[in-house]
Design a protein with these regions (language model features):
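Acidic, serine/threonine/proline-rich low-complexity intrinsically disordered regions
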Residues: 170, 184, 237-246
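Bacterial Sec-dependent N-terminal signal peptides
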Residues: 1-30
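Conserved, well-structured interaction surfaces
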Residues: 46-50, 54-60, 84-161, 177-192, ...
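Conserved small/polar residues in nucleotide/adenosyl-binding loops
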Residues: 247-253
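Membrane-proximal, proline-rich intrinsically disordered regions
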Residues: 21-71
Length: 257
C-alpha cells in the first residue's frame, strides 16, 4: 500500500513538473524594445534615462592617452614630466602629433557626444509616456535630468578641447557629408549656452532624491556645475579668448626657476 501511494505521488510530481515546463516553453517572448514602444512604460522610460548617465566621461581615470593607463593629463603639457619615453603623450610634447594618430582616450570626446545625442532623443520623446504610467511632475524631472546631463557633457569637454560643436536640440546625423568641415562654436557661445541650460534645468529638478535614487541630478548639482563653469571661464588662462603675453617675464642669464 505504501509503495502504491509513493508511486502515485511520484507520478503527480512528474506530471506537475512536465506541465510547468510546457507552460514555460509555451511563453511568448517579451516585446522587444523599439523606438516606438520604449516610452510606453515608466520602467523602460527610466531605464533609457538611467543609461544616459553611463556616457559620463571617465575623467577619474588618470590616462590621457589610449595606450597608457598610468599617465595623467598633465603629462601632455609642461605642468609635469614623466620618464616614460615610449608613451604616446610624448608625441604632443615633441610636436609630432598629427590627425592620423589616435592618442586621446575616446571617452573624452566621442562618449560625451553620444550622451548628448541620447539626451536629445530622450527629451524629444519622454512626453510620449502615458500619464497613467508617468505623471507630469516626474515627467518634468526626467526631462530636466536629461537636460542637465546634456549640458554637463558639454561642460566636461570644454576644459579639454576649448570650444566645441554645439548640437542644439535636434539629433544630428553624424554620417552626413560636410559635417567635418563645420567650424566650432566660439568659447563665449559654448559657455553661455551651457550656463543657460544648467540654469533652466535647475528650475525643473528636485532639491533632493530618496536614498534609492542617490546620484541622480538635483537642483544643487546643476547650479554647482554652472558656478564652476563660469568660474573657470572668467580666467584668461582658461578660456584663451584674450591671449596673455608673458614676454615681460624674463629671467637673468643662467638663472634657475
Amino acid at each position: 500500500m505504501k509503495n502504491t501511494i509513493k508511486t502515485f505521488a511520484l507520478f503527480l510530481t512528474a506530471g506537475a513538473m512536465l506541465a510547468s515546463c510546457d507552460s514555460y516553453l509555451d511563453r511568448q517572448p517579451d516585446e522587444p524594445l523599439t523606438s516606438d514602444n520604449i516610452f510606453k512604460k515608466q520602467k523602460t522610460t527610466l531605464q533609457y534615462l538611467t543609461n544616459i548617465y553611463s556616457y559620463q566621461p571617465d575623467y577619474e581615470a588618470p590616462a590621457c592617452v589610449s595606450n597608457s593607463n598610468d599617465i595623467p593629463w598633465e603629462a601632455c603639457s609642461d605642468e609635469t614630466s614623466f620618464a616614460y619615453l615610449d608613451r604616446s603623450y610624448t608625441q604632443i610634447n615633441y610636436n609630432s602629433w598629427n590627425p592620423s594618430l589616435h592618442i586621446y582616450r575616446d571617452d573624452t570626446y566621442n562618449t560625451p557626444y553620444k550622451g548628448i545625442r541620447e539626451a536629445n532623443y530622450f527629451m524629444q520623446n519622454v512626453h510620449k509616456c502615458p500619464p497613467e504610467e508617468l505623471n507630469d511632475v516626474d515627467k518634468g524631472y526626467y526631462y530636466n535630468e536629461a537636460r542637465f546631463l546634456r549640458a554637463h557633457f558639454y561642460a566636461m569637454m570644454l576644459p579639454v578641447y576649448g570650444p566645441v560643436f554645439l548640437i542644439g536640440d535636434d539629433p544630428v546625423d553624424f554620417t552626413q557629408s560636410g559635417l567635418d568641415q563645420r567650424e566650432r562654436n566660439t568659447w563665449d557661445e559654448c559657455v553661455n549656452y551651457v550656463a543657460n541650460e544648467l540654469w533652466e534645468a535647475a528650475k525643473g529638478l528636485p532639491d533632493s532624491w530618496p536614498d534609492i535614487y542617490y546620484g541622480r541630478a538635483t537642483k544643487g548639482a546643476a547650479l554647482a556645475a554652472r558656478a564652476r563653469l563660469l568660474l573657470y571661464s572668467a580666467r584668461k588662462l582658461f578660456n584663451g579668448n584674450e591671449p596673455v603675453s608673458y614676454t615681460h617675464l624674463t629671467l637673468p642669464t643662467n638663472s634657475r626657476v
